[in-house]
Amino acid sequence: MNNSKKNNRKETNNASSRVSISWYPGHMAKTMKQLETDLKLVDVVVEILDARIPVSSQNPEAQKLIKNKKKIVVLNKSDLANEIENKKWLKYFEEKQIPAILCNSNNGEGANKIINKLNEMMSEEKNIAQQKGRNKIVRAMIIGIPNVGKSSFINRVSKKTSMRVGNKPGVTKNKQWIRLTSNVELLDTPGVLWPKIANEQTALNLAYTGTIKSDIIDEVEIAYNLVKFLIEKYRKNLIETVSYTHLT
C-alpha cells in the first residue's frame, strides 16, 4: 500500500500479542519469479484484495514488481465487509488515481465492471491501434494473495465454473489465460505471499480471514485475539449473533 502521508488509511489495530508468520512454499518463490517475467506480456494488473483487510491483503513484494504498470484494484468479498468502510476504501484508491471496484464473488455483483474498466484504461492505446487498422487486445494479469477469491472472481467475470475453486489457501497453482471478450484477456496467477509477515496486525488479519493454513499458526492464540477484538469493537453484534449473554 502506498504509504504517503496524505489520506493514509489503516485497518483497525487489535494486536495484543507477538504474532508473526513465515509461510513461503517453494511454488510461491517460483511464482514471484514467473510473475516478474509475465508482467512483460500484459498491459494492466488487476489486483484482487480482500475488502475486509485491503492493506493486509496487499503483497509488498508484488507491489515492487508492478509499480510501473497500470493497475485496477478489486475489493473482493465486499459483502463480508462493512459497507461504510467499503465506500471509504473506494474513495481512498480514487484519490490515489487507482481505479477500484467492489465485488461480491458469491453473486457476481460488481464483477462485470472489470471489462469496462480495462477498456477505459486502455482507450488511448486502443484508439492508436484502430487508426493503424489493428485491433488492440487488452491483456491483464490477475494477482492476489491466497484465499482472496481470485478464482471465484474470474469464474464470475468469465461466466464459467470450470476453474478449480477452493476455500484453502494456494488452490490455483498453474498459469491460465482466460478470454473475456474478443479483445480482453486475463492471465491468472497463483496466490502468493511474501517470505516473512513480520507486522503483527497483518499476520492476525491474514489468519482471521483464512489466508494462512491452520497447521502453521497457533489457532488458540488467533481465536483469543479475534474474540477480544470482536468484544471490544462489535460487542452488541457479537451478543446478538452468538447469544453470549454472559458478555453483557
Which residue ranges define each predicted feature?
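Short coil/loop residues immediately preceding or within conserved phosphate-binding loops
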Residues: 137, 160, 175
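Helix-rich effector regions associated with P-loop NTPase G domains
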Residues: 2-45, 52-61, 65-71, 84, ...
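Post-Walker A helix-loop "phosphate-sensing" segment adjacent to the P-loop in P-loop NTPases
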Residues: 159-167
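G-domain G4 guanine-recognition motif of GTPases
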Residues: 48-51, 74-82, 103-109, 209
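Canonical P-loop GTPase G-domain recognition
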Residues: 82-139
